[in-house]
């Protein structure tokens, strides 16, 4: 091979002539074909002989020795005092360590210092000593020198890339060298150089010429290295794949025969091919499966990638591709199932039956709407979906989406990833073993969003009737028909659901249960279920109506019945234990356990919640409001306390920005109408107002507390008590208008549960009264209002006297509130 052309053949030498150094007389050490360059440190083990004695003497003197390097066949001449011609150049090295060992040898560490021109040998025994003149590289500069150094460093990087396993610190050290001679000496110690190359570099005194020789050697070795890699790749490709597989199959056949397995058994490839042909699926699915099977056959079953392909084929074979014959929809039977599984929820059941009726008449022509049940926890959203599946005679599957943050959870991961799998939609379809199940997407309002994508965007395709007939999972990469699936979503709140996703669903709101409904649900569903679950019979345990009501009122506070079921289960466990213990002791069943109110307290401990009216008596500065929560509704006692100060407004109770603005609106409204309420205008300059909404640890943010805040504020500043049996909800404006609110059913249920008898609501919400439970409408005096004046006439025990007509019964002559009545 011709030596590579050098870009630096005509490189000018721009350096000064070195100054001649004084001669030195040093002990000489003869090494074999191991060249130690200047700037290198090498450990050696030296046997007895001339070199041993030379180092021993040097260790006693100034520790410097002269190293020369000769071929192996020349060593004998130096050992027998008959050396051939001394080499022209050696290396002055310093002994860093000289340790004599028990076996007569010495362990030494040599550090190369500089080159030296050898003049003559002046001593032969008992060791060699020579006259020499040290040589130091002259300083050099110039763009060409920099270019040459940069090129050599790039060659070093390329060599490291091919060889690998080179410490990064060594590469960085090479890049920090800024002298050409030093760079040449260090690089020469690499694996690309043999003894001849290193000796040639050592004998070259000119630093630029020395580096040029290093460049030529590296260039030649890199070409050889690339050629060697290419030859290996070509040889590997030439290997006949079919011959390789033949040998592997023969080995497999012999292994099976040795293990005693049936050699006539089906080949895995043939078995998969048979299953694909028998698969009841569209042609494009079979074609994709056969294409992957061909890849599997070409690679062989023992190829690392064969496991990925085999898993992919197993997924295709396990999915329900074929249309199935569905049972006839019976509206009467569906109604029986819904009534048997759920008490109440008449509006919801009516909408479900309408949906089933249209599906019965329209058949496949109907694009199924996506139902979304929205309501507090424990009201039966998921169990409604299970009942629909039972009524239709379809399979039921459920996927919880709470906390899902990765789009791949819905669409799956691409097969390029290790451990890739289909998304939750395809996994659920596989588990259902049906192409048309009832599919519950639970907690769609709890889906998260982060850097991995937006899962709700993937759900858009799933829930769109115009698109889901060709749903594409990233893992399968084959369209899958979801149009026959009845999707039902559930959520606790509507606001967190993105608008595009909400637009694809028909919202059906499920409110909380009334006390009577909970009583009937406990009697008809929860108690029989828990009694059977705990191995009890009707003859062993009985719940009185008073006990059930006590559980509802004083041990649970929820819109649904999940907590009620837990308390019933707890009572059943306690009774089951007593039945088991008494049966073991007496050998016969004990008498029936009757769970009454006293037994509830005995087994469950003291009451956890206070049941009754919101306040025990009419109070000044305290008004009862209602709030909507994810668990239903709850009452709020809003407290206002004025005291002498500088007109500051203080708000406590973890109020949100909206509620803080409602409080400021209430203060501004009352201040603008101070004369109408008999309040001295100076009161607002000389009085601090503190508004507090218990419980302090619970965050609150709702504009519907506006009229409640205003009522409590007017009551506190005029000394007029607020009626204890009145609750209210509504947003107030600066002009005293009452604006509509949401969650009326939950709020009225909370007020009814708390024993409130009069409920003030915005006039624009009067249309929603018909949606309230009959018992609530019958027992709660619902009064729609449109202004604060109407609210005050109902909520206050008496109307405040205007300033121009007051008799001093409500405010003093400074307009400050009178002391609260006794007992408030």
UniProtKB/Swiss-Prot annotation:
One of its GO terms (molecular function) is ATP binding. The keyword Cell wall biogenesis/degradation does not apply. GO terms for cellular component: cytoplasm. The keyword Ribonucleoprotein does not apply. It is an enzyme of class 3 (hydrolase). Induction: By heat shock. Its main location: cytoplasm. Residues 10-20 have a biased composition (Acidic residues). Residues 26-222 form the Lon N-terminal domain. It is found in: Cytoplasm. PROSITE patterns: LON_N, LON_PROTEOLYTIC. Residues 802-816 have a biased composition (Polar residues). Keywords: ATP-binding, Cytoplasm, Hydrolase, Nucleotide-binding, Protease, Serine protease, Stress response. Residues 617-798 form the Lon proteolytic domain. InterPro entries: AAA+_ATPase (IPR003593), ATPase_AAA_core (IPR003959), Lon_bac (IPR027543), Lon_bac/euk-typ (IPR004815), Lon_lid (IPR054594), Lon_proteolytic (IPR008269), Lon_Prtase (IPR027065), Lon_prtase_N (IPR003111). The active site is at residues 704, 747. HAMAP family: lon_bact. This is Lon protease. It comes from Chloroflexus aggregans (strain MD-66 / DSM 9485).
